[in-house]
């Protein structure tokens, strides 16, 4: 019985930091470039949250994920992924495109 407080303290010391770390982690989302288009074409994200955005390029050519609205510009090699951290973002629409082929566009709607 006298070891119960020690056990509870040890349990809390091991368990609670993991809970706090998971709560602080950015929410994961993915945009995929395949067959010359982004999917989804319009990604909905929550406002005022940190976001971990994976940009996956399934095409055979490299692409450049670019957005002046988001102030991001990053090359994605063929058949590769990049991670882009965003936010917290305010409500609105944020456009992006492939700078190597500007006809390939998408948008992020934040609500």
Predicted ranges, named:
Residues 41-59, 81-89, 95-97:
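Beta-strand cores of secreted/periplasmic/IMS beta-sandwich domains, seen most often
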Residues 13-21:
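C-terminal segment of classical bacterial N-terminal signal peptides
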Residues 1-8:
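Bacterial N-terminal signal peptides that target proteins for export
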């Amino acid at each position: 019985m006298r070891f119960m407080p020690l056990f509870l303290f040890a349990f809390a010391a091991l368990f609670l930091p993991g809970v706090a770390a998971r709560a602080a982690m950015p929410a994961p989302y993915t945009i995929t470039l395949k067959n010359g288009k982004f999917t989804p074409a319009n990604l909905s994200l929550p406002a005022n949250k940190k976001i971990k955005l994976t940009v996956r390029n399934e095409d055979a050519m490299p692409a450049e994920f670019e957005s002046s609205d988001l102030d991001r510009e990053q090359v994605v090699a063929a058949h590769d992924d990049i991670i882009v951290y965003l936010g917290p973002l305010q409500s609105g629409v944020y456009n992006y495109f492939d700078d190597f082929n500007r006809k390939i566009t998408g948008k992020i709607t934040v609500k």
